[in-house]
Swiss-Prot record:
<dbReference type="GO" id="GO:0016328">
    <property type="term" value="C:lateral plasma membrane"/>
</dbReference>
<dbReference type="GO" id="GO:0006885">
    <property type="term" value="P:regulation of pH"/>
</dbReference>
<protein>
    <recommendedName>
        <fullName>V-type proton ATPase subunit B, kidney isoform</fullName>
    </recommendedName>
</protein>
<dbReference type="GO" id="GO:0042472">
    <property type="term" value="P:inner ear morphogenesis"/>
</dbReference>
<comment type="subunit">
    <text>V-ATPase is a heteromultimeric enzyme made up of two complexes: the ATP-hydrolytic V1 complex and the proton translocation V0 complex. The V1 complex consists of three catalytic AB heterodimers that form a heterohexamer, three peripheral stalks each consisting of EG heterodimers, one central rotor including subunits D and F, and the regulatory subunits C and H. The proton translocation complex V0 consists of the proton transport subunit a, a ring of proteolipid subunits c9c'', rotary subunit d, subunits e and f, and the accessory subunits ATP6AP1/Ac45 and ATP6AP2/PRR.</text>
</comment>
<dbReference type="GO" id="GO:0070062">
    <property type="term" value="C:extracellular exosome"/>
</dbReference>
<dbReference type="GO" id="GO:0003096">
    <property type="term" value="P:renal sodium ion transport"/>
</dbReference>
<dbReference type="GO" id="GO:0003091">
    <property type="term" value="P:renal water homeostasis"/>
</dbReference>
<dbReference type="GO" id="GO:0070072">
    <property type="term" value="P:vacuolar proton-transporting V-type ATPase complex assembly"/>
</dbReference>
<dbReference type="GO" id="GO:0098850">
    <property type="term" value="C:extrinsic component of synaptic vesicle membrane"/>
</dbReference>
<keyword id="KW-0472">Membrane</keyword>
<dbReference type="GO" id="GO:0097254">
    <property type="term" value="P:renal tubular secretion"/>
</dbReference>
<dbReference type="GO" id="GO:0001503">
    <property type="term" value="P:ossification"/>
</dbReference>
<keyword id="KW-0813">Transport</keyword>
<dbReference type="GO" id="GO:0097401">
    <property type="term" value="P:synaptic vesicle lumen acidification"/>
</dbReference>
<keyword id="KW-0406">Ion transport</keyword>
<keyword id="KW-0547">Nucleotide-binding</keyword>
Length: 513
């Protein structure tokens, strides 16, 4: 295995060409490759899964990008994961199939992985490595940004306080999402999480009042969609949905499909978030980032960890998966002095519907709540099958209430939660003792349970309910109970909203959207 030195012009005076090139190269390396020439290595000593081990390399740096040239002339890129003496371990993003240890050459670039970003990326489709796959031209970059992002000063972050209206009642009333929040959808195989995400994309916007002075126009709204390991059907579903609704011009898609290299999935969400950060903090757009499927990402992480022979953690996943997931999820929010925001909705499929699996478990620690998609509700033909009991939005308290939605919002949400939880208990009791043994109060809770699932949770995929309509629907269900049983709502709020006429009069000035 010979090491070739690229002998371009530029040797030092008074020395042979090769020696001058070698000295020039050494200076270039210590100056981060500002000048040429560079060394071309042909020292691949082993290939293990997605990893390539290089021997006899000099000045290799952690996270440095390496370009491989295969015997047939095709180019691939990789990233240095580990350097030990003269050896370097490189993960190849496009996969290692076809790499010949004797004939493959590689070149160290001296730079980290940067992606070209531009406002023109909206309306475009890229593969998992950021290359255009929509037959369009290469992106004319406004800037080249590090895909790992820049650290944000925690003191300069703004607390998310503007509620996003999704038009989906169980989310808007009971798990309100704030602009700048990170909230995942916990789903499982065969459940309609893609349809829910597409509906949120179609309908998401600020809660609008009839006589607003502020600009709520949708021109500054953008969607960045990253797919990891999804099948062609899912990718086509989202693409056609964006096109049919006329929003494709505000969407940037990164697609790593199931037949694409597994290792590419590690950089796909980072490319998407780097693009989102540029759109949010430089172009001042409000960006909604959808990442699906984070389970595929975690499995790609496990594959690299296994190839490096690291000590595995729970179920074979690496011990640093929590940290790695945090580097993705924490890139959401708002920054002082910037008009844009990044709201993240990662989608993950729980293996075997197990919420204690390491992927949903660690995701729930990092993110600000979760939306739980339930298989039992789906089997009963309820769409969206969102189970509100295990669902949670930790930033809901600051995004609702008088001045943002309506002053009864928090109380209605608490009472609906309480009644639904008691209704579930009564339903379980009924299965044991029978309906005849239930009290009149228990029967009221059963009636509430059925109507809540049928009328409140259930709605059409193109049905867009305002938060005020959803709150009115909640009051309509709560009127099943006498006032004395609504213990979670203050008496003043009950007096104002419990009677049908009072609720309608209060609602009249606010509902025109």
């Amino acid at each position: 295995m010979a090491m070739e030195i690229d002998s371009r012009p530029g040797g030092l005076p008074g020395s042979s060409c090769n020696l001058g090139a070698a000295r020039e190269h050494m200076q270039a390396v210590t100056r981060n490759y500002i000048t040429h020439p560079r060394v071309t290595y042909r020292t691949v000593c082993s290939v293990n899964g997605p990893l390539v081990v290089l021997d006899r390399v000099k000045f290799a740096q952690y996270a440095e990008i390496v370009h491989f040239t295969l015997p047939d002339g095709t180019q691939r890129s990789g990233q240095v994961l580990e350097v030990a003496g003269t050896k370097a371990i490189v993960q190849v993003f496009e996969g290692t199939s076809g790499i010949d240890a004797r004939k493959t050459t590689c070149e160290f670039t001296g730079d980290i992985l940067r992606t070209p970003v531009s406002e023109d990326m909206l309306g475009r489709v890229f593969n998992g490595s950021g290359k255009p796959i929509d037959k369009g031209p290469v992106v004319m970059a406004e800037d080249f940004l590090d895909i790992n992002g820049q650290p944000i000063n925690p003191h300069s972050r703004i607390y998310p306080e503007e509620m996003i209206q999704t038009g989906i009642s169980p989310i808007d009333v009971m798990n309100s999402i704030a602009r700048g929040q990170k909230i995942p959808i916990f789903s499982a195989a065969g459940l309609p999480h893609n349809e829910i995400a597409a509906q949120i994309c179609r309908q998401a916007g600020l809660v609008k009042k009839s006589k607003a002075v502020l600009d709520y126009h949708d021109d500054n709204f953008a969607i960045v969609f990253a797919a990891m390991g999804v099948n062609m059907e899912t990718a086509r579903f989202f693409k056609s949905d964006f096109e049919q609704n006329g929003t494709m011009g505000n969407v940037c898609l990164f697609l790593n499909l199931a037949n694409d290299p597994t290792i590419e999935r590690i950089i796909t969400p980072r490319l998407a978030l780097t693009t989102a950060e540029f759109l949010a903090y430089q172009c001042e757009k409000h960006v909604l980032v959808i990442l699906t499927d984070m389970s595929s990402y975690a499995e790609a992480l496990r594959e690299v960890s296994a190839a490096r022979e690291e000590v595995p953690g729970r179920r074979g996943f690496p011990g640093y998966m929590y940290t790695d997931l945090a580097t993705i999820y924490e890139r959401a929010g708002r920054v002082e002095g910037r008009g844009g925001s990044i709201t993240q909705i990662p989608i993950l499929t729980m293996p075997n519907d197990d919420i204690t699996h390491p992927i949903p478990d660690l995701t729930g620690f990092i993110t600000e709540g979760q939306i739980y998609v339930d298989r039992q509700l789906h089997n009963r033909q309820i769409y969206p099958p969102i189970n509100v009991l295990p669902s949670l939005s930790r930033l809901m308290k600051s995004a609702i209430g008088e001045g943002m939605t309506r002053k009864d919002h928090g109380d209605v949400s608490n009472q609906l939660y309480a009644c639904y939880a008691i209704g579930k208990d009564v339903q379980a009791m009924k299965a044991v003792v029978g309906e005849e043994a239930l009290t009149s109060e228990d029967l009221l809770y059963l009636e509430f349970l059925q109507k809540f699932e049928k009328n409140f949770i259930n709605q059409g995929p193109y049905e867009n309910r305002s938060v005020f309509e959803s709150l009115d629907l909640g009051w309509k269900l709560l009127r099943i109970f006498p006032k004395e049983m609504l213990k979670r709502i203050p008496q003043a709020v009950i007096d104002e909203f419990y009677s049908r006429e009072g609720a309608l009069q209060d609602l009249a000035p606010d509902t025109a959207l």
